[in-house]
UniProtKB/Swiss-Prot annotation:
Residues the record marks as site: Transition state stabilizer: H16
Binding residues for substrate: S8, K40, L72, R86
GO CC annotations on file: cytoplasm
Keyword ATP-binding: yes
Identification of the protein by name: Phosphopantetheine adenylyltransferase
Record-linked NCBIfam families: coaD_prev_kdtB (TIGR01510), cyt_tran_rel (TIGR00125)
Binding site for ATP: S8, F9, H16, G87, L88, R89, E97, F121, G122, T123, I124, S125, S126, S127
Keywords: ATP-binding, Coenzyme A biosynthesis, Cytoplasm, Magnesium, Nucleotide-binding, Nucleotidyltransferase, Transferase
Phylogenetic lineage: Bacteria, Bacillati, Actinomycetota, Actinomycetes, Propionibacteriales
Species of provenance: Cutibacterium acnes (strain DSM 16379 / KPA171202) (Propionibacterium acnes)
Main location (coarse class): cytoplasm
Amino acid sequence: MKAVFSGSFDPITLGHVDIVTRAAELIDEVVVGVAVNSAKNGIFSMDERVAFVKDAVADIPGVEVALVDGLLVDFCTEMGADAIIRGLRFGGDFDYELQMAHLNKAMSGIETILLPAGREFGTISSSMIRSAACNGGNVSEFVPGMVNTALHERFPH
């Protein structure tokens, strides 16, 4: 089985890495799709995000990284994926992800596998990391080392 785990990953967090690690234990091949999202104002370029994701998942067997520019279901078809992986944090993720799962299934027939966030990562989001980092917060326990370094360079305090 091959599955896609996608997101804007601006930046990738240890919660994302945890989902990829756990998905790779269950699924033969996992493609981490770094999505272009024109609706979001990112702090890192697409090239930087792809580099961060590649670095963060480099040691996880069966994982590759690719750029997603367009509909996720079209990307899944392109990649020959059987399923979409989505992580669920504490709070309101379930309702949204269930709606998206039904839409993706209706549009393409592709199934969605929902993985709950690990207890230590259930409240982490990229937007929270960006907010904390730009205000001088220490986010080192929530992001991979390469991302932490880049955040310190982007937001020196």
